[in-house]
Swiss-Prot record:
This is Regulator of G-protein signaling 2. Keywords: Cytoplasm, Nucleus. It comes from Saccharomyces cerevisiae (strain ATCC 204508 / S288c). One of its GO terms (biological process) is adenylate cyclase-modulating G protein-coupled receptor signaling pathway. Its main location: cytoplasm. GO terms for molecular function: GTPase activator activity. It is found in: Cytoplasm; Nucleus. The lineage of its organism: Eukaryota, Fungi, Dikarya, Ascomycota, Saccharomycotina. Interacts with GPA2. Residues 37-161 form the RGS domain.
Amino acid sequence: MASVPSLCDILIPLEKNSRSDGDAESSNTVLIQLRKGHHERMRSPYTIQKFYKFLKRAHCEENLEFFEKAHQFLQLKQNRSISEEKLLEVWNKSLYIKYIAVDSPKECNFSQDTREIFEKCFANNEVPADVDVLCAISHVMGLLMDGYHRFVSSVNEKKYSATYAHNDSATEQDLKNESTTSFSSLGVEDISEDRNSYLKKPDINGLSTIIQETSANTTNESQCSDRTSRPSESSSSLNTTSSTYKNTSTRNLQKPQNTGILNSGKGLLQKLNFVKKRKSFKQPSGVICSHYNSNVQNRLKGQNSHQQR
């Protein structure tokens, strides 16, 4: 993680301005030129360019602009080839009228004493002293501190949001992995082995045979009782509720702990004998149901022929 530089680290040192005098006079834009230091080489988010964009979005970029131009003015003032008149023109046009004068386009929040010094220089057509310009720069740096703290907070917030989103997706993956591995911690393998041991006797085919034989026997008994009590009951009504018996058999098969059902089928016979006494007992569709229907039809035919005789 990149370290957070101080405000001085990103403001100083500035490159020496290599523009000509004519360019300095005609320039109305801010040119923030920094020597690429450690934070620039490391592509740090804390750069002067990003700080300036942050201030510009907040409509408070005037302090940073004044700092840059005042620093350039001091560098220009060290050039002995520049005349006093030229320095005065650059100061008044690029700094005083734009950032210091009352109701200027980008008026900075200077103290009354500092403003009076510059107003006096402007009225007397004098170039301000270096010490006065340095005091103004120092004051502006104090004003920039608040904006820089907000800038650093915004960068950290963005970095935290990105990190949180990444950690959130990683946490979801961890939860998935944890839920997958938690089954083994509950001993599912042991449960599966125990369940398989119950299903060994009898096997699937043997169990199906027991169920079919039991169902067939119960069907014959049910046919007799139903023909005696309700001979007019149609086969279509028997088909409508066949799923009830099927679901009952399925629920019985889903209880491997009942070894009596799986080993001998006695428990299943008892349940079927109890269920067959109910008038609503119906057989499932398929081979058993067709066999039941054929027996009912044959029985009805026999009764009709007997009555005709």
